[in-house]
């Protein structure tokens, strides 16, 4: 539902009287920036603005640290003026080691979705390996540690658990599928990831019910180190 973004764009368009940079940091479908620009152009024929995609990459529980010490700063615009201004704005973070990437607006929008879809894929992969480890009587943590020691893979998001969840991964994996569908592209892998994740949740639910002998009434269930 992009009604709030488009509504805010209409409010902005009615009040622009000098050059402004309109920055979108929210996770939005690719081409949202294009639509925002169209709305603004209806009231501003002289184009007193630049629409920029500047996605945030903050983890839950680590938002302040991730903002102060980001891995990268992504600026989505092909215009020189906002690029120069934003590069100066983010220079304190870049001086601390953050990578600065200036790319197209659509690419910046897609980078956010593609990143979250990849992390969801990584979680789903180790969960499937965990299923295999149970059959082989192997400790999945040993396997994930061994894999993570490879610099090409890394150990983050490689811990087996119930399933991925939260406010981002389920929404973003489905959203990137929707974008692919709109542009007639088939993301077979992401479809499989979503299905596997759903199966993982069902599998663990069945195990819990079995352990409790189908007696769930008045039972308290706690997940430790869960990525739900």
What are these regions (language model features)?
Residues 1-228:
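Structural/interface elements that position substrates and couple domains in central-metabolism enzymes
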């Amino acid at each position: 539902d992009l009604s709030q973004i488009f509504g805010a764009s209409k409010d902005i368009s009615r009040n622009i009287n000098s050059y402004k940079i309109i920055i979108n940091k929210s996770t939005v479908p690719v081409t949202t920036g294009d639509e925002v620009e169209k709305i603004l152009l209806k009231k501003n024929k002289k184009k007193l603005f630049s629409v920029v995609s500047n996605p945030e990459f903050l983890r839950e529980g680590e938002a302040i640290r991730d903002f102060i010490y980001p891995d990268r700063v992504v600026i989505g615009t092909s215009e020189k003026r906002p690029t120069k201004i934003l590069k100066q704005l983010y220079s304190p973070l870049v001086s601390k080691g953050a990578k600065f990437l200036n790319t197209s607006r659509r690419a910046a929008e897609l980078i956010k979705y593609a990143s979250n879809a990849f992390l969801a894929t990584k979680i789903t992969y180790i969960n499937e390996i965990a299923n295999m480890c149970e059959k082989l009587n192997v400790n999945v943590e040993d396997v994930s540690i061994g894999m993570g020691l490879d610099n090409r893979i890394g150990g983050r998001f490689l811990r087996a658990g119930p399933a991925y969840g939260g406010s981002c991964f389920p929404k973003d994996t489905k959203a990137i599928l929707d974008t692919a569908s709109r542009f007639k592209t088939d993301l077979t892998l992401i479809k499989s990831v979503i299905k596997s994740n759903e199966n993982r949740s069902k599998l663990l639910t069945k195990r819990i019910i079995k352990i409790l002998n189908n007696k769930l009434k008045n039972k308290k269930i706690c997940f430790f180190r869960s990525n739900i």
